[in-house]
Amino acid sequence: MAMRFLNIGYGNIVSAHRIIAIVSPESAPIKRTVQEAREHNALLDATYGRKTRAVIVMDDGHVVLSPIQPETIAHRLNNKEELSEEG
């Protein structure tokens, strides 16, 4: 199985097969999840100082902040041409 990567904005990529959820950052439970990840040094901020539009939860407990809308990231995940392949 080839490892696939997903562009989450500004040249940042994550491993596509390790994503559990892509959610909006607006709800209180997601805000709590982001704060807990920050406190446990498991937060990766890929926004380059811009507004967080999507929160990506990874299978290893890391939480990734992205400046791209969740719908756009999901579309990229479902669109095979948008994924980069290793090797």
Curated annotation (Swiss-Prot):
Coiled coil: none annotated. It holds the Pfam family RemA-like. Disulfide bonds: none annotated. InterPro entries: RemA-like. Belongs to the RemA family. This is Putative regulatory protein BCAH187_A3920. It comes from Bacillus cereus (strain AH187).
